[in-house]
Amino acid sequence: MPRLLSAVLLIAVLIVVATLPLVGAATFATRSAADTVNDDLGDIDANASLPLVSTITDRNGNVLARLYDQRRYQVASDRISDTVKDAVVAIEDRRFYDHEGVDVRGTLRALLANLTSGDVEQGASTLDQQYIKNYLLFIDAEDDADRDAATETSIARKLREMKLAIDLDRNYTKDEILTRYLNLVSFGNGAYGIETAARTYFDTSAADLTVAQAALLAGMVQSTANLDPYIYPDAALARRNTVLDAMVDTGYLSPAERDAAAAEPLGVLEEPRTEPSGCISAGDAGFFCDYVLSWLDDNGLDTAELATGGYTVKTTLDPATQEAAVAAVHTEAAADADGVSLSANYIAPTDNAHEVVAMASSRIYGLDADAGQTVLPLTHSALGNGAGSVFKLFAAAQALADGKVGLDDTLQVPQRIEVAGMGDGGAENSPVGMYCVENSGTYSSSMTLREALATSPNTPFIELEQKVGVDRIVDLAVRLGLRSYAEPGSFDGENSVVDVVKASNMGSFVLGPLAVDPLELANVSASLADNGRWCAPTPVLSVTDRDGRDITPDSGDCEQALDRKVANALANGMGGDAVSGTAEDAARAASWSGPVSAKTGTTESNLSAAFLGFIPGLAGATYAFNDGGSVQQLCTGPLRQCGTGNLFGGNEPARAFFTTLTATAGRYGGGKLPDVDSQYLRTGTVR
């Protein structure tokens, strides 16, 4: 500050004081002077909440990520050491406990000292005034203009600051003001508040700061830039010792205590302890963190509120399952593979929720696109070219529910069928107006529904689709978990998937040619594992606010999407895939030998592949798909884009699932496949 202007400011304040009657003492005089400014404490809401860090944890309380605008952890007075309070008072406002917001004696002393020296050697701002200035700068300011106004060099700002400081002193105790000040101010290196500063520089708490540590932090408030101990260690050390001297002068320390503290080195950490804001810091849980933020936003708690609110979000993520899921997808797919990735989601059905316990992608969650990193929601948004034959389970479920087929009934398996009224095209040489389907590979001419679910021929499921109707099958798919298919615009920005499928009577629906949300696919698995009951997938166990109040959003009611007996029959019927079906090799490779309900899926031309599976306590789905700018056929070993595709759901997708299941099944129980009510075993004939 130019010394002339500084002197003018101080003189201006004193002139205002001097023009008032002397009767009533200095306090009355300063209060009258301050009354020339119209603002009062209510105009800035000094009782407003400070911006605090919000924390996202896994289900065990381990921190996944933090979100903040200002990195601040607020603590109560009894969690701030008396030593740091004494240090701040000694160096910044030694008459703090005697004045009433504005220190007239200190102002006169500063004026005399500065005019005598010809420079600004002493300030005149009390801790109350500093609190007001910092509050206006860090809390009240909404834009650069407000921030400039909070720091401008003007008589008006100084008078306003004085008025508000007096109001502050009228409304709060000295300890409340000092605690607010220590929780508010910046200590540099992104640390706001004394608790954050203690963690940043010393990896300790505000309650446990030593005398030397407290003195260093108290001294830094004067100029965090010029007293940064990492950039200007000598200046920081000198300032710390000045604070120690001030503590002796004010009676807070004995000379011997001062000497002992002054003999200590700076003692700061080798580097300041920082905590990045956002999901990038969540590492392998980055995609899950992104999903949590999206879920919270959908449930009324947006990211902007999280960045200031000081919330604690305890999520459903199970660290052991997450570790296994991440390791499995990284084993099966390279993080930097061109144009293709592998996602995996796992859900644990509970009494009243479907808890997302793991979410993994072969991609790294990050901003380095050249290294294959991305922040796109690859694990929880509709993408790719579909889950393929996984969708056959919807036809099987509806046919079982309608009594059109039993698990042990015999289905005819023609190599090729042509059907009218279910779309055009399909296999080569399809007649005009006909939908033509062929099997991929060679099959017996007949087999049971169990065998068909395990080995996945195409033609019998198209015939089942004809019998029960496309409309009912797509409605069941939505009820079981593909809820986004019913959302307006989900197909082309204007029409929903459901509307388009029904309007065209899309025969190919049961062959899974449509983009799918990997998380929704996993929730279909969870609904079947949960005896046909759908619950919205949830990533959150609890949300508490800064005061510890539970504000957890209601995740909604569960629904019986499919009759319990039908769901159990289907789960039983899906038990052959890992034993003698398309997932047999993958299960064996992972040393999995227990019961599991499963279904593989591969789309036309091997553009994507999926796997869905579940045991009673854990359900999941994996999905390999084109995630780049071009759509190409996919190959296995390694997973990659290629000219002639040979990827199937029983390859990388199934292997990733079974590897994860082998590592984690003990955490979720297991047991035999569900029993089947006799009415779902045989109907006598396929009707």
What name fits each language-model region?
Residues 62-73, 196, 200, 225-229, ...:
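Short pre-catalytic segments that frame enzyme active sites
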Residues 254-314, 323, 327-329, 339-340, ...:
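Non-catalytic structural connector segments
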